Amino acid sequence: ALYKALLQDDSLREDARGYVQKYMLEKVAAEKHASTVKMEAVPGFYRIYSSVFLKIMRTSDLWESEQRSGKDCFDVTIKRCLWHTACAENGCPELCRLFCDADNVTYGGLRKIGFSRTKTLGYGADCCDFHFFRK
C-alpha cells in the first residue's frame, strides 16, 4: 500500500522503490537479523530453529514447498510464496525482490546458522532454494 501510494505522487514516483527498499533492508530485515542473533544465545538454537522453520513450512498454506533435513542442514524448496503471490496480485511484482533481499540480510552473518540460496521466485526463477546449515 505504501509503495502504491508513493507511485501516485509525481514527486516521489521515481524514488518509490528506493524508499521501500531502504525500509525493508535497513529496518525490517535488520531487526529480524538482530532478533535472530539474540535467539542464537539459546542452547540448542539450531535444533529449535530448524524444527520450527520446517514445521511452519509443512503446515502453512501460505507457501507450497518441499523440505529435506539432516543432522546439520535443512533445505526448503519453495514453489509458491506468500510474498511472490501477494506482490503479483497487487500489481507490483517488482517488490517481491525486496523480500528476497531481506532474507539475505536476515540470515546473513549469523554465528550458528549458515544460509545460501541460488535462485528465487522474486528474481524470476522457478523456485526459491533455501539451504540452511549448522556452523
Where are these regions (language model features)?
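Amphipathic interaction/junction segments at domain boundaries or subunit interfaces
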Residues: 1-90
